[in-house]
Amino acid sequence: AIVNRVGHKFPSGVGFRRAFITFEVLDGDGEVLWASGRTDNVGRLVDGAGTPIAGEDWWGPSCSVPADRATRAHQPHFQSVTAESQAQIYQELVSTPPDRAEVTCGHDAKPEGILTTSFLSICAEVKDNRLLPVGYLPLPERKEIARAFGAGDDLAEDSGSTAVGEDPDYRTGGGDNLTYVVPRDALTGTPASVRARLYYQATPPFFLQDRFCSARGPDTDRLHWLTGHLDLEGSPAEDWKLLVADSGPVKIGN
C-alpha cells in the first residue's frame, strides 16, 4: 500500500513525470528471485531478461518507428501484478490527434493518435493514474465547485483519473493498494523476504527519446550531448531514478 501525503496528485507538474514501484522477491542471501519494476542503467523499466517492457521505447534505433507505436503501447493501471513484464507506473499519458481532416480533441476525446510529450500536440488523455491526495473530493463535490466558478462539469470530470477501471482507491483518494501474485514455479530459489520501493523520474527515457527523434536544432543537439555525458553513478539519481520510499526487506511468514 502507498499513502500519498503530498497534498496533490503525485507525480505533479509536467505530464511526463512518473513514479513506479519496484517489487522484489529475495532469497536468504538477499538475491533477487523475481522482480517487477526493475530498470536498466538509463532508467528504462525492464523484465527479468533485461528487455524493456511495453511502453518504454517510443522510438527505435536511428529514430525508427516501433511496430507498437500506433497502438499507444504502455503499462496500464494494475490492481494485481502477475508478471515481471508488468510494472505499476503512476503517470499521465496523452496522445496526438489522429491523422485525418476532422478531429475533435479535449474533453472525452477518444485516444487515436500516438503517445506524445509535446504540450502542443495533446488531443486526448490515455491514462492518468497519478496518486490522489488524502481527502480528494468525489465528482459531485468537484462539480459544485466548478459551477461556483462559472465552469462546466467538464472541468470537474477532467480533474479526476483516467483508465483506472473500478479501482476503489481512485474513488476515495489517498493512495493505492496493489497485489503482487508471484507463481512459485517462477522462482529459482527459496523466497525469504520481499521488498518494495517507490521511485520517481522527472525525465523518463521516453521523454528524451521523443525530444531527440521529434525535434531538430542546436538545442536538441545540446541536450543530447549533456545527457550522453551525464554521470549519475553513485549519486541519488543513479540509473535515472530517485528513491522516494523503501519498505526494506520484509520476511515472508511460514
Question: Which residues does each PLM region occupy?
Answer:
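Short, conserved sequence motifs used for protein processing/export or organelle targeting and
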Residues: A1-N254
